[in-house]
Each structure stands twice: as C-alpha cells, then as structure tokens.
C-alpha cells in the first residue's frame, strides 16, 4: 500500500511477537497531539490500530501516530516494520541473499555513519559475526539492543531500506546499554568506529584471539617469558615518522606488531642471581583458533558452533590518529598499502592449531584474505565521515555510503573499480577485517588465477605508491 491509499486492508502475519509493545513504549512514550488530524490520517491510524490488535499488541493512538509520521504516513511500511521486528524478537536471522539489491541505511542526524559502516562490514556479506546475534544476552536492555541489531541485519540482507528512525531506535538501545554516543545535552555524537566494534564485542562476548608472547633478553629465563595474551582487536601502529608521508605496506606494520617490538623495564635475574631491569625483544604469534577465556581467567559463554575456527576473522585497526605534545589531534596522512591477501604463515603458531595435523605430506599454510574495510575521511575520529566496504566472492566489492542519497550501496566488480577501491583503502582504511585461511601450497596458484583482478589491482596500487605524485591513471 502506498502512502496515498487509505482503505486497503493489511494482511496480518500471525508470527508470534513478544515484548514489542515494551520496546515501542520505551522509544515512543505516549504524548498529546498538538494539531488536529485529517480524516485520511485518522483512517490510517485506525487501520494500523486494528492490525496491531489482531497481532495481540495494541498501542496508544499517540504512539501509532508518531510511527506513521516517521514513515510519511505509509501504513504498509509501519506494518512491515512490525512484522520484521517480530521476527527479530523471535531470534530469526535472515541468511545472506545474493539475488537481492541491498538498499542500505539512512544516516541519522549526520552522526550515525560509524554505526552504519561497522554493521555493514560485519554482517552484509559475511556470517562470521552472526554468533553475536544468537548469544544469550544478560539483561533486558542488552536483549532489546540485540533485537534491533537483528532487525538491522535482517532488513539489510533482505534488500529493505533502514530509515533514520530505525537507526535512532538502535542508538537509544545502545545508550541504554552503556554506550556513550551523545553529548551532555543529549544530542547524538559521532564516535570511533573501532570503539563501537569493541563495545559490541564485549557486550555480546565475542571469543578472544589468543596470542603467544615470547620475550628474548640477555638475563636468566623466566616463566613469564612465554605466556598467552588475548585480544579482540589488533591495534597496529603505522611504521615510521608520523610526519613522513612516505607510503608503507600493511605487511611492514604487521612485522612491527608481531616481531619487532621492544619492551623495557622488565625485572629479571642476571647471571649473578641479582634482579635487574632489562629490555626484551617481544615476538607474538597468533594461535589459530578462538578462545573462550582470557589471560585473567575470565570465561565467556561462547558457543563453538557460532564461532567456528574455520571462519576466524582477524580484526585490525590502523592507528592513523594520535595527539601531539599540545594534546591536539592529528592524522597520519601516509598511504598504507592494503593487500587483498597477506602471507601470514610467519605470524601463526601452527603447532598450536586446534585440528589434527595432516599426515599426507602436504604442509598447511596460513594467509589472510581481506573481507571488509571501514574507511574514515577526516582529521579526527569524532568528526568526518565513515564508509563501509565488504567483499562478495562472486559479485565483487560493495560500498555503503549512508550520505549518498542516490545510491547508498554501490557494487564494484570491474578491474578499474577494484583498483579505485584499493587506492581508497590505502589512503583512508581504518578498520580491517581479514579472514584467516588455511591453504595448501599446491592450490595457491590456481586460486590466484581465479582472483586475478584483485592481484592486478594490488599491483596497480603498488605502482601508484611508487609514483611521487601518488596518482594512478587507468587507461
């Protein structure tokens, strides 16, 4: 039914819906009407009221009026929203559907791009984080937020538009769970996308990534020289002088993080059994599985089937932003060469793998495959703009720009488009989601041939870095 139709009946879906009224009461409290309604508007309120009564969840007239106002008095849109909300409340998650066109979401008050882009990269074309939507959340507020996250994901994957008032509802739920996303006057603010990812990861207990830490020094060996630490997000510094804009590669940054870190002020015993402070070379290696406990002995309720090791995602954040001596924010403007694949074999402790070794005489190698990227455009994380990018193995890359009113979700599946995206990643990439893959050396060449365009795009990106003007023109 379009907004101009008033008398058509609405087909009632009798899927069980629980606690929807509580959610609406929280988000849309009853209020008095300030101006009289037109006859057509009253008719639409009556239609929707009848529909909700048949569902068993009647609402006050003022609440129904508010919902219709936010949806341009389109009864069908509001009814569909309630149906989708009911499915989300029941825990239903829509599978990724390749045959639909994603419409994306609308920016809420010019400050929700960090939410929209992170959720798009986590859920649009990967199910690696779907376990966060299934976990048994503690507390009413966390469960209500989880329902609205499922609503966002389901509508995104179903090709339905997510309007700004749905994003507003989601933000209200986030704040009720402790997220600080507004100023002292209650106005919404833009926040750090990586902090938002961590907030969701902690709230819904994303399993930990265990890292084996080894300290090398000239003093006597100590039990603490080898231990396991855990992370949910790997924070990678950009090598070199922050003021030097010479391009670097992500591989260089990973080497610095995993293999080239010096730790000082460690107390160890020397050869004379005297305690002394030493500096140590720290080497980290990823243990290629998820962990349900951290180094403090805290355990989470992660279900292994929701987060299989075969679908492990390594989230990386590039530390492009910092503060100078005057506590003023600054951005590191050097390009970081973001490859579609990373040879990760040297950064993984394969002896600690949680699967039986292969006895066929073929070694298993580890590599990272780029799945999603959040780019930030601006000089500080609390301003500017975020866009989300995600890869579909069959269709190519998709970009979400919630400020693009003409085409919020755009597909890139040509060599020229892919090259443009990777150049954009090098300049603005902030939050990177890589999938850890186990590959046999014998089939790597075949896979590389299939994914030829991405490697050509990678090479063109490298050529651009070699150009002093950092400008690549495709013919």
Question: Where are the regions that the model predicts?
Answer:
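UBL (ubiquitin/ubiquitin-like) substrate-recognition surfaces
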Residues: 2-475
